[in-house]
């Protein structure tokens, strides 16, 4: 059976950048550490889930492109500050993962999260999403699971209520009522 690993690229590089920053005790350059931790994380996911295919979905837009949601709703993610530092090694990381046989996927004007949802809908076989973003819980079903690398938790339909504190059928309704504090 086909199994596709879908990795949230922005979430991954941001998390591994913070790990590299904590490990860099002498305040020297940490590009090598960041690249190492990122590639090591990807390798550990491939070993853990043994996919037939791995795809890293990135949030990057070209300079002339804008996010469709921000064009429609100027307040979208207005409370978030963008820190370019965690993304300084993206080009090197992307080249290296391609050499290792992983596909880089660039959504252009869309959010990487939306593209992961699209890929989950359109790819055959089982999909494992790797991200610390809890919004992906809404995608979990009989052919999609979510692995949170921060908490080291794997959520499937069978343990969904333990992770989300509600039944799967109620999850979207509860999310709509609560809203998203980070946005």
Where are these regions (language model features)?
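Feature 3881 marks metal-assisted phosphotransfer/nuclease machinery
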Residues: 154-183
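Noncatalytic, basic helical substrate-engagement surface that gates or grips nucleic-acid strands
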Residues: 2-130, 136-146, 150-153
């Amino acid at each position: 059976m086909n199994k596709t690993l879908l990795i949230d690229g922005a979430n991954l590089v941001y998390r591994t950048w913070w790990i590299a920053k904590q490990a860099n005790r002498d305040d020297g350059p940490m590009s090598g550490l960041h690249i190492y931790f990122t590639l090591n994380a990807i390798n550990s996911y491939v070993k853990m889930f043994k996919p037939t295919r791995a795809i890293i979905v990135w949030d990057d837009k070209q300079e002339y492109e804008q996010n469709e949601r921000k064009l429609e709703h100027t307040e979208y993610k207005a409370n978030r500050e963008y820190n370019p530092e965690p993304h300084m090694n993206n080009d090197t990381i992307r080249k290296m993962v391609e050499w290792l046989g992983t596909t880089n996927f660039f959504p252009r004007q869309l959010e990487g999260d939306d593209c992961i949802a699209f890929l989950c809908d359109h790819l055959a076989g089982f999909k494992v999403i790797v991200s610390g973003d809890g919004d992906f819980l809404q995608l979990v079903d009989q052919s999609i699971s979510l692995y949170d690398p921060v908490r080291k938790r794997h959520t499937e339909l069978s343990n969904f209520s333990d992770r989300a504190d509600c039944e799967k059928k109620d999850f979207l309704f509860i999310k709509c009522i609560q809203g998203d504090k980070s946005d």
